[in-house]
Amino acid sequence: MQYVGGGQGDGTYCNPIIAADFSDPDPIRVSNDYYMVTSTFETSPGVTVLHSKDLVNWKIIGGVFEELDRIDPAFSAKYMKRYNGVVYASAIRYHNGLFYVYVSLYTDGMFYAIAKDPAGKWTVHTLKDKHSNPLRMEGWTDPCPFWDKDGKAYLVSSNPGKNWFGYLFEMTPDGSQLLDTDVEHMKQRGIAYEYLLGGTLYSSSSSTEGNKIYYRNGYYYIIHIEFLDGGNVAGTYVYRSKNLYGIKENGMLGKPGDMRTYEMKRFDLRNTGTYRQEIPG
């Protein structure tokens, strides 16, 4: 294991906590332990996995993809043709005694991996569409899974391009299949995807990425960033509702294919050195 933390050994720490290229960090807490995954671009092992007891001192404990060139030879050191188009913004979650990592390889499709021990071997699978076809296509990125209290599973993701929108998908309870997608429809670029072929549109802003979904104290939170000012103003957007698909003003609940409205708040951290936000609820 490789130590990469920011602790100074005297009860203090320095920022950045990890002074290296560990971009798109996604941490979770399981009991008294923290685990985090970060982007690796074309480098193997793909998707770095780290462990901490205090969110300050981190150790690299493994990687999800042992060799990315098993996905495509273009990842290999011989060709090196995947640098700016591969392992971005994965998400790690713990569900029913197992660790899950979801990641879209920008040039190669949607994948998920499962492990009993996050420091051990990960079993990698290709995510499938509603027809059980592998979701091998370009463009989709920044996925995040979510298991609701009723056992139903969901995924948020977005597709960079002309219509850089965010989508909410229904998954099978085991997280292996998107129930409202068709890979041939998902292969198209620069369009607004249709429900039952490409999920439910949740954000029609200009540059939706960094998608995350959480449930806390009776509220669902869908979080993403906008880094372009062409649609909404750039910043971090937090959507909140007591119904996952939102609620209309007359009280009607949203549902798959018919998204309603959320409480929404935008945070712009570009011009502030520090920021603290207390989450309601």
Predicted stretch roles:
Residues M1-G281:
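Carbohydrate-active catalytic/glycan-binding domains of CAZyme proteins
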